[in-house]
Amino acid sequence: MSKQSQHVLIALPHPLLHLVSLGLVSFIFTLFSLELSQFGTQLAPLWFPTSIMMVAFYRHAGRMWPGIALSCSLGNIAASILLFSTSSLNMTWTTINMVEAVVGAVLLRKLLPWYNPLQNLADWLRLALGSAIVPPLLGGGLVVLLTPGDDPLRAFLIWVLSESIGALALVPLGLLFKPHYLLRHRNPRLLFESLLTLAITLTLSWLSMLYLPWPFTFIIVLLMWSAVRLPRMEAFLIFLTTVMMVSLMMAADPSLLATPRTYLMSHMPWLPFLLILLPANIMTMVMYAFRAERKHISESETRFRNAMEYSAIGMALVGTEGQWLQTNKALCQFLGYSQEELRGLTFQQLTWPEDLNKDLQQVEKLISGEINTYSMEKRYYNRNGDVVWALLAVSLVRHTDGTPLYFIAQIEDINELKRTEQVNQQLMERITLANEAGGIGIWEWE
């Protein structure tokens, strides 16, 4: 009898909806980037469309790439036509953007883990290399080669800088975004904290640009404060909005960078020392909290690992699609597989077919929140293909936003109990047959 497997099917939106959405997003960000150049400043405008295309390539299968390239390019062209005339269109630049996006997406896929692309500083450095260094340098080189001008060095630097800033501002956000992140903001506290931090950061950044010397130093402190207060996704969103606001202010009023604001320094000459101490103090406390939390997590993991590993009954952490994530020795002995072998299997493959449907029904109730735990007797295949009985107890661990993370399963060997029940049942059947054959009546007197 063949072992069966079960996969969770997720209904995805129609691909056409993806392409239309990408085209609209590309249109909006292209419009913003081109608006910066309308002010006639020497500031290299932020260029977001390449980063949008790069993220879309990274997140979608290769068969979608032609449609993504077409929809994003149409969004760019529509924004250009809206602000300028059709004669100003330069399809060479659009083609270079596509080349950069393809190269960046391929590099990001090679350099970053798929499920959680930004887990540490090393991942961020690889992201910067794959999106904000190599593709912009390649694009700048192609611009100089294919569209030579009077000042190729200036064109190269402006192109590289605008692409790099856009990538660092937008790509982390695009790589991290998952639909279930939006569910977190059903928590009023997180929503309020995120909006309050955004409002404070934008307001103080605006005031810094208008009235303070070295405004970017103050903005760095504000962004560090935002990063400390908020989760990763919300922090990157604040970084993006702050960069867009500040760039718009600089494009509208170039004198913001040229004005020394000596009047403030004459009253507060020691202000630079405050700027030295604030980031240092913030990072000190952040690192202390990080080390303390890491120590606490390590101790908790050690206690849990020991409790699981030395348990007399089988225990396992099971993914939401049925894969065995972690198993203890008792379970491995019960099923006859090693831990490495079990990681390549699912519980659906090892479950007796007659028990699988009932088990999956309970799993669905657990995921939907109808029940918190369930237990049942079920049969498994062991390594030799024999059927073994187990008492299964399952509970679900959820993320803070309520999304399921993994199951905790306790699997107790009840083979001996089932054999005893079978022997007792056979014995009672024999006694009943003997009594019927001998004409013996049995009754109870109270």
Locate the predicted segments by residue.
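Cytosolic signal-transmission helices at domain junctions
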Residues: 122, 285-302, 429
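Sensory-module boundary signal marking interfaces of small helical input modules
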Residues: 290, 297, 400, 414-417
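PAS/LOV-family and closely related PAS-like sensory domains
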Residues: 213-216, 228, 234, 238, ...
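PAS/LOV and related PAS-like sensory modules
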Residues: 298-324, 329, 333-334, 420-445
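Short aromatic-rich membrane-water interface segments that cap or initiate transmembrane helices
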Residues: 153-165, 265-271
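Short helix-perturbing small/polar motifs within transmembrane alpha-helices
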Residues: 4-45, 51-150, 170-238, 246-252, ...
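Sensory coupling linkers of modular signal transduction proteins
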Residues: 171, 413-423
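PAS-family sensory domains
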Residues: 286, 403-413
